[in-house]
Amino acid sequence: MSQLDKVQAWVSDHKLDVAYISNFESIKYLTGFGSDPIERVLALFVFPDHEPFLFAPALEVEAIKDTGWNHPVYGYLDHEKPFQLIAKYIRERNANPIHWGIENNNLTFDRYEVLRSEFPNAKFEQNLTPVFEKFRMIKTADEIEKLNAAGAEADYAFEVGFNAVAAGKTEADVAAELEYALKKRGVMEMSFDTLIQVGAHAAEPHGATGMNQIQNNELVLFDLGTIHDGYISDASRTVALGTLNDKQKDIYKVCLEAQLTAQAYAKPGITAASLDKVARDIIDKAGYGEYFIHRLGHGMGMGEHEFPSIMEGNDLILQEGMCFSIEPGIYIPGVAGVRIEDCVHITKDGCLPFTHTSKELRYL
């Protein structure tokens, strides 16, 4: 049964007349067609007992057909009113759809209002956002194969990036060199902006690559990822240029112990919260707890941040096929930042990483 078939069965089981799917990641997951329509309307409509259809800007129609989509696709031109056309195509299948499912976390209020004006009797009673979060949380063998391929691309990027590090270069220089090497290799898209941070700049976990010059005797943090056939990689390594002082070495040692211990602990049957605690306890015991300022990990797949969330308070039981990051970090303002990250998938008795670049402290 395809993912689209599963959604159609869910729609039928929950007595809905129609499911309106508006999140472009959900659409890609169900149809194989990926596009961010920006201000235009891209939508998938699924019915319990009628064929689904895609509604898209006219300029996307041929690309949709090229994916192998074998159900109706309707295009619209920029001067047309998309929701009037959508209403027409829905009524061809159901003259008066009452029970609707929508993605609450994605559908904008203005589009919701237009939809209500077209279907004044509609009851938008099912939030599809958690439904798709649950569907996407367990990966298939095919999805894991794509994630492994993306991980191999990230490993290559690390090697290029490490070799590019030199005193006097900027963070941006290193990012540009590794991304250029990836493009020459046929990797056209990063999963997020490559992050290179040197020295104290790395103590800003959501900072950005900049023009900071790399100096000797500093730590350099890499956080990067690629997109392979719609699936992402995401990994972090921290390396040393020159000689480190005892504080820098200790921060790295503690962070590495937390990451390795958590990765060894990850398996089916434990809770997300307990996995976070394993890493956090190590960092707390070493005296750096106040500097570990984010959750241990986030789900990943087609999106950079999916479910599950590996954090305190999340009692979700880990299951085979779940994919997420394990990324403890220690960020001491004005001193240094260290983060070590692999994304993993849960197997029947443990977990396996998508990236394999060594996590032992590397001196360049």
Question: Model-derived features: where do they sit?
Answer:
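Active-site neighborhoods and metal-handling regions in enzymes and metal-associated proteins
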Residues: 1-364
